[in-house]
């Protein structure tokens, strides 16, 4: 679900000091992202999120494709996941899988939605209304490139939900 496909695997046997044998598996991967991804820039975030998925601390679904496709962190992908689940609960017609695919196709829009959310709610400083308006204009401009009406509706509903949000605990750090 990270937007990659395994194209090769090389196992290596490692003999431990106690005589037991462990295995190291080296996987060759191919990116399936809809947009070019700079893996080197996203490597740390990807590795942290992969470990969290492996340990059951982060959901394993198609929103994780946005880590490489849109350069999001696992936490930012969780933000979009939460809005998608909320929309489904209040009567959204699109499945989570379809919403995930929409954002995988339009990764820049996913990134802009996260920026919009951060601009509106980040406690690190008040973002001007003009900056928020500019982000909304960028989103509207990107929507002109969305060919599918359903995809357009999904993105617009996310903008509506972010704008309807009054407060959030998203920025609370868990201990």
Model-derived segments and spans:
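Non-catalytic regulatory/linker segments of enzymes
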Residues: 1-175
